[in-house]
Amino acid sequence: LEQLLKFLNVTLDTLMLPCHFCSSFMDLNNKASYLASQLKVIVKDCCFKGACIKCRRKLAFAERQKYQVCVGEADLVEAMVGSHVINLTVRCSECLALLTASEKLDAKCELQTFILVRHMWRTSCRAC
């Protein structure tokens, strides 16, 4: 999204970005949340599209239901992967936001559950 804004030479508040799933136009808060989540903008029907928070939450839930492989705490994840959780790509299990290094460490210290969904680890972010 950040590259798209630069390419189009527009600001986040002026970009008209519909949700890929529900087709409603995303408001500034939704676009800011989408930008922070570092999810990709897609092109469909010659139109750039994102995903509103409501649809991202529904998608995250549906993917957990359908594609969940295993569940465990950070120590299990590190043993399985052979790397510290800070080095892994981890998304929020609720809103699909990309977790920061500090959020991953907090999740480990708080013994939060990590869920393997579609070959990617997920746990809750600070906002959720």
Predicted regions and their residues:
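N-terminal pre-domain and mature-chain start segments
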Residues: 1-128
